[in-house]
Curated annotation (Swiss-Prot):
Its EC number is 2.1.1.74. Catalyzes the folate-dependent formation of 5-methyl-uridine at position 54 (M-5-U54) in all tRNAs. Belongs to the MnmG family. TrmFO subfamily. FAD binds at G10, G11, G12, L13, A14, G15. Keywords: Cytoplasm, FAD, Flavoprotein, Methyltransferase, NAD, NADP, Transferase, tRNA processing. The lineage of its organism: Bacteria, Pseudomonadati, Myxococcota, Myxococcia, Myxococcales. GO terms for biological process: tRNA methylation; tRNA wobble uridine modification. Its cofactor is FAD. This is Methylenetetrahydrofolate--tRNA-(uracil-5-)-methyltransferase TrmFO.
Length: 453
């Protein structure tokens, strides 16, 4: 395979994972990333694999669907999971990372790989056939390339994601904030908590509703992903919605009083040293002046908050994957092009990396002249593939982005004791099914990790 060069466009989680999987199988890769020549509105760091929303890759517990996906990716030698483990910061049972060190680690691994050539330029045209290419340009695909992709697929849609603010640690009032992880998970100081009584909470919700928001372009109708809703959009759904959502106080009793607040704002550390903390669930489209005003005035403990980063919104572009893509993630109308990551309609960092891995394996199968061998459907990777092909959805389904969830898995057979029993059955079945699929992988220089448990 060494004489064949594959182009990977996009240096995010999907693109870097695809490039890594191809390179470790002996394929020469040209990884094209538009930074620093051009940056999207949401990108700040100079390196690859920049995390622009949260610094959390979510639950690392395999009894959670995304935690099971973590496990499967580790077993398959994932670059993203390997670097995440190396740069992990305490976050209870979640896999959170120091985002700068994580980006640096991914960048270094690919820069040092002899089979990878990184090119920094913006592409405005899709690569022509017959050479194979992986398009992993993500939710912030530049306009020119997005237009070319729309012409090719006829399937472009977009909605908006929103980014949460980050606060400098020294500006948080520790006489008000208290350290505690929900239900006592983790080391106990993975999160800081800002308690709100009922009056404070209601005043905050009213401020969110009245605050000035960034307007969308007149020709674009915002379509938010339910898993990343702006906090003010949730507030619009009802007075107590936030108190039952990201500000839920359950399991976060104030150790100084022994009482549960009416609502709690959680802050999760951004780095190992805890110099910066992000406001969990506070994705927002409030204007920057309004964010400073509202969060300082209405959130206890943030009266003197210094914001390392303020929230913002950005467009998310994705194709109607079940109709646009073949089962091997190649574009039906242009089979030399493979899509990976959020542009396919997967949602989440880990799902994007997993999609990059799947696209790379599909390319390897194409190069070897064999049919694509999809992951077993009962695995987390297989469930994600079922989402992309539409197999997990009813006929006529209005395709929307999705995280990996057990609802995407094939139904279980037999009887299982409660929700926990069903999760355990899903995990046991997935582990059994993944092993033989791993054995079909092309030879690599990096051994796969053993199964957990």
């Amino acid at each position: 395979m060494g004489d064949t060069r594959v182009t990977v466009i996009g240096g995010g989680l999907a693109g870097t994972e695809a490039a890594w999987q191809l390179a470790r199988a002996g394929v020469a890769v040209e990884l094209v990333e538009m930074k620093p020549e051009r940056r999207s509105p949401a990108h700040v760091l100079p390196g690859l694999a920049e995390l622009v929303c949260s610094n959390s890759l979510r639950s690392d517990n395999p009894l959670n669907a995304v935690g099971l996906l973590h496990e499967e990716l580790r077993r398959l030698g994932s670059l993203v999971l390997g670097c995440a483990d190396e740069t992990r910061v305490p976050a209870g049972d979640a896999l959170a990372v120091d985002r700068e060190r994580f980006s640096e680690a991914v960048t270094a691994r690919l820069t040092d790989h002899a089979a990878v050539r990184i090119v920094h330029r913006e592409l405005e045209e899709l690569p022509p056939p017959p050479a194979l290419a992986v398009i992993a340009t993500g939710p912030l695909t530049a306009d020119a390339l997005a237009a070319r992709l729309a012409e090719t697929t006829g399937g472009r849609l977009h909605f908006y994601d929103a980014i949460a603010p980050i606060v400098a640690a020294e500006s948080i009032d520790r006489s008000i904030a208290y350290a505690r992880s929900r239900y006592g998970k983790g080391s106990g100081d993975d999160y800081l908590n800002l308690p709100l009584d009922e009056a404070q909470y209601h005043a905050f919700v009213e401020a969110l509703l009245q605050g000035e928001k960034v307007a969308a372009h007149g020709f674009e109708e915002p379509r938010y992903f339910e898993g990343c809703l702006p906090i003010e959009v949730m507030a619009e759904r009802g007075l107590e919605v936030l108190a039952h959502g990201p500000l839920k106080p359950v399991g976060l009793e104030d150790p100084r009083t022994g009482r549960r607040p009416h609502a709690v704002v959680q802050l999760r550390r951004e780095d190992v040293d805890g110099t910066a903390w992000n406001l969990v669930g506070f994705q927002t489209r409030l204007t920057w002046p309004e964010q400073r005003r509202i969060f300082r005035a209405f959130l206890p403990g943030l009266a003197n908050a210094e914001f390392v980063r303020l929230g913002q919104i950005h467009r998310n572009t994705f194709v109607d994957a079940p109709r646009v893509l073949a089962p091997d993630l190649s574009v039906r109308a242009a089979p030399h092009l493979f899509l990976a990551g959020q542009i396919t309609g997967v949602e989440g960092y880990v799902e994007s990396a997993a999609c990059g891995l799947l696209a790379a394996r599909a390319v390897l199968d194409r190069l070897a002249g064999r049919a694509f061998r999809p992951p077993p459907p009962a695995t987390a990777l297989g469930a994600l593939h079922r989402h992309l092909t539409g197999e997990a959805h009813p006929p006529g389904y209005d395709y929307q982005p999705s995280n990996v969830v057990f609802a995407l898995f094939p139904p279980l057979t037999g009887r299982h004791r409660g929700k926990a029993g069903r999760k355990e059955a899903h995990v046991e079945r997935a582990r059994k099914e993944l092993a033989p699929w791993i054995d079909t992988a092309p030879p690599t220089a990096v051994p796969a990790a053993p199964a957990a448990g």
